Amino acid sequence: MIQTQLLETYTVPDYQTWKGDWELIYGQPLAMTPSPGVLHQRISSAIHAQLFSALEPCPSCEVLFEIDVEFTAETVVRPDLVVICYPAQGDRLTRAPELIVEVVSHLRSRRDEVIKFDLYQREGVAYYILAYPEARKIKVYRLSENVYVKVGDFFDERLRFELSKCSFDFDFGSVWPKANPRS
């Protein structure tokens, strides 16, 4: 006889009491350790800087670093970057961003490539961007008829993004740090 072990599920009020950095996906807690390394931070900062600059002429949209996004009573995630085109209120977002960026580490690649891919697609995030620092590659997905369609793999090309309230060009080549920065 096969016995099924039921996993305990948690909710946002539980999540709010936890110490440390966690995400809660479909009621399951997932630790966000170890913290992002130097290369991860450089890539994330470069993407943030470019998005910030690109969105400056568009007062309806803004880019935010590592903010909690509460999709349901059992799901709260903290993407590396999000772009929203609605007024943010409170300490977390409770509506889907239009664009999410995750800088992928080998330790959490399954979470970003499978679990969050499905979650963001289901929740209606228009663009999902996965940055791979070691490969110096960025994958871009766009939601089309409720399904992510791969726009492409980008290394140093440019791409135009069309959000609900603005559009902008993004230069993927400017994301990658130069050899031996600040040395």
Indicate residue ranges for each PLM-predicted region.
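Gly/Pro/Ser/Thr-rich low-complexity, intrinsically disordered segments predominantly at protein N-termini
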Residues: 1-183
